[in-house]
Amino acid sequence: MKETSTFSQKLKQFVLLFFPIFITQMSLFAMSFFDTTMSGHASPIDLAGVAIGTSIWIPVSTGLTGILMATTPIVAQLVGSKKKEDVPQVVIQAVYLAICASFVVMLIGFFAVTPILNGMRLEEPVERIAAQFLSIIAIGIIPLFTYTVLRGFIDALGKTRTTMIITLLSLPINVILNYVLIFGHFGFPKLGGVGAAIASTATYWCILIITVMIIRTKEPFASFHIFKQLYRPSLSSWKEFLKLGVPIGFAIFFETSIFAAVTLMMSNFSTTTIAAHQAAMNFASLLYMTPLSLAMAMTIAVGFEVGAKRYNNAKQYGFIGIGLALAFALLYSILLYFFDDEIASIYTTDIQVHHLAKEFLIFAILFQISDAIATPVQGALRGYKDVNVSLIMTLIAYWVIGLPLGYILATYTDWAAKGYWIGLIIGLAFGATFLLIRLFQVQRKYTIENRRSR
């Protein structure tokens, strides 16, 4: 990141920041995408098992990943304010925190997974695949969370192209292992959805190893000497980190877990409905990678400018990010409307699943505008380190408005499973409105503060 003086310079720098993040997120998502699509071609039961497993795993992983994402705005503001010497301490303490969080998640999962799955009244093969999927994924928790911290450090320096290269190097490993283990090629057993979990876990370890090697040997990362000194664990540092990270993590958890909750509630419907819902939701999540990537870029850009006390520049980056998100939303809405049949065919060859997935995809169009506003706005707010109010706003929008409304529509109207999608759409719309208002308030506060300091 560097200081800019014109709007065109900011736009160029933002796009150069965003594009590698986008490729990185798409590559990471591709792992989940291939897990789902390949499992679906193994059988509808494998697809349903992976759907249930990921619906439990994703909210947990994204919520804790969100907490660890606090590394990015903290480091970005330190770099912006010329406090490079403080960065290694922040990163190492965050790594310690990531490892501790990993063990806590594994311990809770050991006791909680079986009761959760038993309470869902799934078909026996689906429950078995989901349980095995989660058991294997647990082995990849430590590398995934540790990588999240190290990626936050790399991205905060504006070197998003590096994380893109790391992920692109790892993606072929995931695809090849999926192909071999799910379908049983080259003498390996045919494991179905369980093979997808093994492939993802192995890939997480590969990503971590590559990242550590780059940080130790390549500039500008090596000059920070991140691993030169292993600082003693500092509870006060953890507390400061968590003050920012916990609201970020819970805000992400509230958003992702509502989708997972809907998938779990779908267990009351048939395996066909679960599979169709998972296919449509998986593609909607693919499109979500764009506003999510824009949000990450906004956190870096806004955080850098706020650290340097260039508040007007931070405000301009906010508008650039939201404008680009709305443009992409329009493009994706057109894609969903005209190519729903082709998209559904990617996930399944089962006629019933295919037909129902097409119906769900139409609802995904309505997700686009809300996601285009809410997600980038959250990224900008993180750059300002304003996270507590947005946490409350997302809780209300998604869990007080969206999910209860979806349950009512699905249970007491003829919409059935589609009622959950309508509830999600309305909840996302409220969330986008709340968050946009908050961003305007924060920008105004910093504008007034800037005038007073002159």
Curated annotation (Swiss-Prot):
Task: Look up the record and give one Gene Ontology term from the biological process aspect.
Answer: monoatomic ion transport
Per the record, GO CC terms? plasma membrane
Q: Which residues cross the membrane?
A: 13-32, 47-69, 90-112, 132-154, 166-188, 193-215, 244-266, 286-308, 317-339, 359-381, 388-410, 420-442
Give the record's membrane topology.
Answer: Multi-pass membrane protein
User: According to the UniProt entry, where is the signal peptide?
Assistant: none
| Pfam families attached to this UniProt entry | MatE
- CDD domains attached to this UniProt entry: MATE_NorM_like
Specify the domain of life of the species encoding this protein.
Answer: Bacteria
User: Which keywords fit this entry according to its UniProt record?
Assistant: Antiport, Cell membrane, Ion transport, Membrane, Transmembrane, Transmembrane helix, Transport
Where it sits in the cell: the answer is:
Cell membrane
Check the record and name the InterPro entries matching this protein: MATE_fam (IPR002528), MATE_MdtK (IPR050222), MdtK-like (IPR048279)
Q: Which PANTHER family match?
A: FMN_FAD EXPORTER YEEO-RELATED, MULTIDRUG RESISTANCE PROTEIN NORM-RELATED
Which family is this protein grouped under? Belongs to the multi antimicrobial extrusion (MATE) (TC 2.A.66.1) family.
Query: NCBIfam families in the record, alphabetically?
Result: matE
Question: What is this protein called in UniProt?
Answer: Probable multidrug resistance protein NorM
